[in-house]
Amino acid sequence: MSKGAWSKFPYAEKAYIYTGAALKKNWDRLHRGDAEPWPDDESVQEAWRLYHQGEFQKAAESGLKAGIAGYAAANKATAIYANYLEKDAGRKLALFEEVARRAEEQQKAEPKYPNAYYLHAYALGRYSQGISVVKALAQGLGGKIKDSLTKAIKPTAPRRMKASNTSPRPSSSIPIPPSPASNMPTPW
């Protein structure tokens, strides 16, 4: 993991602190966009708790200590931090590379876990924007992003629709209600 202290989350407030059972109670709302399943492992729960209160560095460290089971929390914390809070361009790219590498490890260990593919694509996409799309395409990143997104979306489409409480839109005249906002902007 990238060395040095990360910038503090500038919007810290009590509403983002989910102590005890509050995290589980709010889980579906907080993870409506990514359909992340509730983790049984308490150390992974703690990593997510830290993520949701904006303690991104601690969340990443906690997720990594939990092993593969904590990679989703570590990767999401790192990717969201890098995208929204890291000011140094070189460090931002290094963080996205870390997420992509860990996501590849997780894909090998858990080949049917959709968020390993989604976070891989997200990290490579943001990395690509940082180095220029032309350079990224020359490195073959476009194909890797497409492959990961295909694997993330295709097998989970019904689950993701259920998680977001929407159904396929048969016509444009049927409104689909927006998801309630979680404590951070979500990338989807």
Residue ranges and their predicted role:
Residues 91, 136-137, 179, 186:
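Sparse recognition of residues in long alpha-helices and their boundaries
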Residues 117-120, 148, 166, 181-188:
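TPR/Sel1-like alpha-solenoid repeat signature
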Residues 78, 123-129, 187-188:
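Hydrophobic face of amphipathic alpha-helices that form TPR/SEL1-like repeat modules
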